[in-house]
């Protein structure tokens, strides 16, 4: 089967870099940097679509649903990267934000031949995690045509879930198959077709906003503090103390005592201090407010 790449912006040559192999290193890097500066501007054009996606994800979380990223190659790895950071940062289970990649775990470290061309595999990978109508799927593919991702999106639509897409070529099959389509038009890559570069950077920026925005909307952030952070290493133990001190304007000893009484749960310690409650009382109040600290202290 012949694939026509001529209409894909991500596959065209970039006039700014046609002689990049002849440039001194500093000039070469300057060209790359100048092109990278276009990425955030391209993503800024998508804020209305990203808003819709964030609100859909937050609503799914409220119903016990999950956020599932799916992609092949770099796109799949970026989804896994974003998903893997959610449990330590926001204290959610590893099942709440899931990243799937064509070819499975082996494909995280090395290419798996032909995996991205299997549409049925994409659907099967969703079936394997019991993907359902309460979940949200985000299909990621710079080209906008990856069969593995399209197969997953078709299955997600069939079960009644909200389907989003992140791509970099306007009018692609991926964009057309989504309820919410986020198309970051970043232009041709510095190295023709190397969509791990500008396209990958755009995907990462959007993924950052999707997960962060949904976590903020569901009470995982107080002010700009990650109040559900888990103390899984020495740095994060210290961060917890600083968060409690910042959130309550208390002394270090007060924060340490509250955290000890709260079994090292930041939110509980903060509510204890702000509302003058015991640990059990703070937990009860947090539960009744769906985890929103701001609703516990008024």
Swiss-Prot record:
Instruction: List the EC numbers from the record.
Output: 4.2.1.126
Q: In which pathway does it act?
A: Amino-sugar metabolism; 1,6-anhydro-N-acetylmuramate degradation; Amino-sugar metabolism; N-acetylmuramate degradation; Cell wall biogenesis; peptidoglycan recycling
Q: Name one GO biological process term.
A: N-acetylmuramic acid catabolic process
Q: Which reaction does it catalyse?
A: N-acetyl-D-muramate 6-phosphate + H2O = N-acetyl-D-glucosamine 6-phosphate + (R)-lactate
Q: Which domain of life is it from?
A: Bacteria
Catalytic positions are 85, 116
Q: Which residues cross the membrane?
A: none
**Any GO molecular function:** carbon-oxygen lyase activity
**A Pfam family reported for this protein in Swiss-Prot or TrEMBL:** GKRP_SIS_N
SIS domain residues: 57-220
Entry annotated with the keyword Transmembrane? no
* Keywords from the named record: Carbohydrate metabolism, Lyase
Q: Which HAMAP family match?
A: MurQ
Homology family:
Belongs to the GCKR-like family. MurNAc-6-P etherase subfamily.
Q: How does it assemble?
A: Homodimer.
Q: What else is known?
A: A lyase-type mechanism (elimination/hydration) is suggested for the cleavage of the lactyl ether bond of MurNAc 6-phosphate, with the formation of an alpha,beta-unsaturated aldehyde intermediate with (E)-stereochemistry, followed by the syn addition of water to give product.
Role description = Specifically catalyzes the cleavage of the D-lactyl ether substituent of MurNAc 6-phosphate, producing GlcNAc 6-phosphate and D-lactate. Together with AnmK, is also required for the utilization of anhydro-N-acetylmuramic acid (anhMurNAc) either imported from the medium or derived from its own cell wall murein, and thus plays a role in cell wall recycling.
What name is this protein filed under? Answer: N-acetylmuramic acid 6-phosphate etherase
Q: What organism does the record attribute this protein to?
A: Aeromonas hydrophila subsp. hydrophila (strain ATCC 7966 / DSM 30187 / BCRC 13018 / CCUG 14551 / JCM 1027 / KCTC 2358 / NCIMB 9240 / NCTC 8049)
């Amino acid at each position: 089967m012949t694939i026509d790449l001529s209409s894909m912006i991500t596959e065209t040559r970039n006039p700014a870099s046609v002689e990049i192999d002849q440039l001194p290193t500093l000039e070469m890097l300057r060209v790359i940097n100048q092109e990278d500066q276009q990425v955030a501007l391209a993503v800024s054009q998508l804020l209305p679509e990203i808003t819709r996606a964030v609100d859909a994800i937050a609503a799914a979380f409220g119903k016990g649903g999950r956020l599932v990223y799916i992609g092949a190659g770099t796109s799949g790895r970026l989804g896994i990267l974003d998903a893997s950071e959610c449990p330590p940062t926001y204290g959610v289970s590893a099942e709440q934000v899931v990243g799937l990649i064509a070819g499975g775990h082996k494909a995280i470290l090395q290419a798996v031949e032909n995996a991205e061309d299997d549409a049925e595999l994409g659907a099967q990978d969703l079936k394997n995690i019991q993907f359902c109508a309460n979940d949200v799927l985000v299909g990621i593919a710079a080209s906008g045509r990856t069969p593995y991702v399209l197969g997953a999106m078709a299955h997600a639509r069939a079960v009644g879930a909200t389907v989003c897409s992140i791509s970099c070529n306007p009018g692609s099959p991926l964009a057309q198959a989504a309820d919410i389509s986020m198309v970051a038009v970043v232009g041709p890559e510095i190295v023709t077709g190397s969509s791990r570069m500008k396209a990958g950077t755009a995907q990462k920026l959007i993924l950052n906003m999707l997960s962060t925005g949904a976590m903020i909307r569901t009470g995982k952030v107080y002010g700009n503090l990650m109040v559900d952070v888990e103390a899984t290493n020495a740095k994060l133990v210290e961060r917890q103390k600083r968060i409690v001190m910042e959130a309550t304007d208390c002394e270090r000893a007060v924060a340490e005592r509250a955290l000890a009484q709260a079994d090292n749960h930041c939110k509980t310690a903060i509510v204890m201090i702000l509302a003058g409650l015991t640990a059990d009382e703070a937990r009860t109040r947090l539960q009744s407010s769906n985890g929103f600290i701001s609703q516990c202290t008024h």
